[in-house]
Amino acid sequence: MSLVDLLRMGSTTPVSSGDKESHVNIIEKTDEEIRAAAEPLWRDLVKHSNEGAYGEFVKNFSSSMALAMDQVTVGHQFANSALARNLSDDFDYLGIIRRGEYVTVLYRQRSSKRAGEWLGRLVLGYENGKIRIFGASIF
């Protein structure tokens, strides 16, 4: 789905990966380390949302989040959401919220076609030793 509607399915509570073998906790990283990991992921989401590229859009999702993303529904969102297909590369980092085994990175996101600003939310955590996306949305 698009960053606008579909990823609200990511809800305010991240989808659990069930990964108990790796106890790396992202909240132990510094803000700078988290931001360095998050920004390329956010840029990729913006780019692939604009392109309507489902496979690329979900490539950094946690496995359970990727499974929750139905390709038909995502394609429909890409086709029908003007915001999801016109996100600007112009965004501002706002901050990080830590909780449990996840961090939420907040962005001020703009559109290349619509006036105004939106709040972007990217939820990150570890799965199988790699930083993955457990939720994302634009409000």
Question: What residue spans do the PLM features occupy?
Answer:
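Short, charge-rich amphipathic segments
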Residues: 2-16, 51-58, 85-88, 112-117
